[in-house]
Amino acid sequence: MSDIYNAPHLQRHNYKTDMSEQEKLFAKLNAKTDAESKRLQRYIAMADLSKQDGSPVKLITEKVLNLPTLKNLDIIETPEVITPELVFDLFNFPKDHPARSASDSYFLDANHVLRPHTSLMWKYYLDIPEIKKRLEENGSIGVLSFGKCYRRDEIDWQHSNILHQIDGFFVIRKDIKTLDQKDLENILVEVCEALYGKDVKYKFVVDHFPYTDPSVEMNIEMNGQMVEILGAGIAHPNVLKNLGIDPEKYNAWAFGFGSDRLAMIKQNIPDIRLLYSQDERVTKQLADLEHKFVPVSKYPPITRDISFIVDKSFDLNAYYELIREIAGSEMTEEVKLLDKYKNEAKFGKDKISYTFRTIYRSLDRTLTSEEVDTKHKKLEEVTIQKFGAVVR
């Protein structure tokens, strides 16, 4: 790997952004009693596994932060609540990008959103006066950030609305090094080989992100299935310019690893909910990063379907959120969209029929048909009330 990451001036410093505004916003949120505020309070109160002793997410994070190529990069801790202008406008998101909507992101109010990723640390890092001075004097800087993120998402073994990321950002003057995608891919491969060995099977897939161009995602094989573990790319010139960096003079790479998935692949963990388990049979296994997870006795699933007709504006992520609220993440293993179709003659204009299958299964006990039926009946009722659905 190039010596640009071990230049003498690159010596790790730790920074923490002022959190006083976040504390005020959380206090204001905690005083509210409406359903949405209560939901956000629960999500915010969930443990940040990247900082929790005994969690494989923390162990993976520490391992990545201290790899030879990354060990000299600074570390910065940033707020979990930011403004839409920071996370979207500065990072080149189009005005109609779905991430800007409440169907994809969690808004505390019109002016504050729970961070959907930790890449926003670019802004906080470059706002530190000494950082730009170091860049001007030495020609390169680099930083890592990690922590909890919030994103409305589907429900299955590898997805959660609460996730953890490890982000990296490296800026260098072009006359020292013109970065290309291969430079970035070399680092990503180094990370994966350090975690999984030289025989790890991976592939890069072209992707598109507002703040990097070109962009790529990386997939790692887990039990014969390719699992996405990150998005990465060369920093978009518009974003560098927005952050006060001359893109004619400097270039940069960036990555964002999903540390939950890194841990799941490392230990062969079959369900993302296990990362939060309090079952001693689970926690003992997760505390050893080199241990391959051995499933504890698996409780039986209970499956229920729901079919309904709704307006074409129906929001899938909002529905997944509703299921989390009604059934609870601890009971909901997976939600599958089985069928979606239009039939104007049968359902009416601008109407769509959906069929979902919910697999109910607890990690620590056997569910009864009666309690699942109660939850599922409630789901039907709220689906009708909230979305104007006609249940079939």
Residue spans for each PLM region:
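Generic alpha-helical secondary structure
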Residues: 53, 57-61, 180-188, 312-320, ...
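Positively charged, Gly/Ser-enriched RNA/tRNA-binding surfaces
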Residues: 59-71, 121, 132-134, 186-191, ...
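Conserved short secondary-structure elements within globular domains
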Residues: 139-151, 197-202, 333-340
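An acidic, glycine-/histidine-flanked metal-binding catalytic module
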Residues: 165, 169-191, 195-196, 265-289, ...
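A carboxyl-terminal module marker
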Residues: 210-223, 227-392
